[in-house]
């Protein structure tokens, strides 16, 4: 089970990575669609608020069922060694580097792992205030079917199917 807090106007696209592709993120270069989900509820709130845990914009919380193969687990030093990833490359100041026209080391890691056939990564949370054991799942390849399955938990079909719910 994973979690994500969404802007309510995008409630109908719970597994899309289009928003992340607009500006890029720590683990996705600009133009690369990716879905970031937290492994804890607390982590999901912290991620959407970028460390401002006591003040946040309206959001809708989702839980997801995940059954995904081809993940690189980078949460531990041992896992990072298996995949030849340096923690400092993941923890880089990706936004500042990208804004200065430099390719962040975290994007280089992503491109290499994608080229090796990975669908995503399990990574520590880098949000300000995150506990050391909080982590995220970052999926470049996802579907509503195996082997890269992620589905939003919505047993009563309450989520809208388009943006007309907000007009």
Feature map (PLM): residue ranges:
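Active-site and NAD+-binding cores of ADP-ribose-processing enzymes
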Residues: 1-22, 26-29, 51-167
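Short His-Asn-centered micro-motif
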Residues: 37-39, 123-124
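Short active-site loop/helix that positions an aromatic residue
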Residues: 42-54
